[in-house]
Amino acid sequence: MKVISCLMAFCIFSLSVVAQDAGALRKKHFNLENGLAIKGYDPVAYFVQNKGVKGKKELAISHQGILYYFSSETNKEAFKAAPFKYEPEYGGWCAYAMGQNGEKVTIDPETFKILNGRLYLFYNRYFTNTLKDWNKNEATLKKNADINWPKLFK
């Protein structure tokens, strides 16, 4: 009985360490400002309002080490029920840059695209809107970004 109890305790401890490591890895590679994702924009609003909407600090939750703000309690609850449905692709970095050369480039949270139920964010400053470039070669850039993003975790 002691052996089983020890094995169970070890398994629980191991899972806890793995979860902590995953959270630390996400924090290292996600596009965060002071631990905050999407520059404080509500990830659910992109899907339900089809626009970027600033979230509120009082409606914040943390998911696997990443802090998200929400514009409404309804959006917060939707995220809690299915966080991976609403999290941005490529850790919230510019999808175009990830596909073009595998680089982490900041984004304009109001420049986005929903594609196959996933949120893609883009750089849009100084006369450069990378969403336009993405749209010209979306299939290739998405394929490349899907290959490049996991490489950053190695």
Place the predicted regions along the sequence by residue.
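Intrinsically disordered, low-complexity terminal tails and linkers in eukaryotic proteins, enriched
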Residues: 20-60, 64, 85-154
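Bacterial Sec-dependent N-terminal signal peptides
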Residues: 1-22
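Mature extracytoplasmic domains of secretory-pathway proteins
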Residues: 69-71, 75-88
